[in-house]
Amino acid sequence: MSDKAVLSCRNLGKSYEEGPESVVVLSGLQLELHPGERVAIVGSSGSGKSTLLNLLGGLDTPSEGSVWLAGEELSALGEKARGLLRNRALGFVYQFHHLLPEFTALENVCMPLLIGRTAIPEARKRSTALLERVGLGHRLAHKPSELSGGERQRVAIARALINQPGLVMLDEPTGNLDHHTAQGIQDLMRELSTSSRTAFLIVTHDMSLARQMDRVLRLEDGRLVEA
């Protein structure tokens, strides 16, 4: 693994037991992401893309191989240590934003900082600044139900970025957005990859989004290949 990689995996595999059979979903995967790099993973439905994201993010355990996040081998860490590492070094954005409906945009973005024991005044200050950066400074007190789809996704991205992680993973981030809003999300990722050196790993069916990334990888037959 390169010392400069924010994420790396070697010989990564995942299989499941179904009765007497072993079903191989992923096998022998190799991947490295570096600061500021934007990589898209494409593939057909059921090819294992979500399984791969869960393995790379430490939400699932591989059947074989290893994953390193921010220089730490995930399999060598206990559950609590993995959780702390994810909160510090990794942001995650889902297709369905997963914002907490009872909290405002500002409170949702504050949440990772508060989990990391940042003082409330500092958390609010940093979260306000980041929401202003993504064009939502006028929507701080609005709850998710009061925001448009694009606004909710920008709040989710701000929440993923608030701890200044080296890597953000996105699962179909523009799947429910109109073209104009989706392009705004793409432009935001491009800007942040340059200004903050944040790496982005994106799973998508949207080839127009994938083609704007630095690299496109296809997941087929359980392996990653250059698309």
UniProtKB/Swiss-Prot annotation:
Localisation: Cell inner membrane
GO biological process entries: lipoprotein localization to outer membrane; protein localization to outer membrane
ABC transporter domain residues: 7-227
Keywords of this entry: ATP-binding, Cell inner membrane, Cell membrane, Membrane, Nucleotide-binding, Translocase, Transport
Principal location listed in the UniProt entry: membrane
PROSITE patterns per record: ABC_TRANSPORTER_1, ABC_TRANSPORTER_2, LOLD
ATP-binding among keywords: yes
EC number(s) reported in the record: 7.6.2.-
PANTHER family recorded: IMPORT ATP-BINDING PROTEIN, LIPOPROTEIN-RELEASING SYSTEM ATP-BINDING PROTEIN LOLD
Protein name: Lipoprotein-releasing system ATP-binding protein LolD
Name of encoding gene: lolD
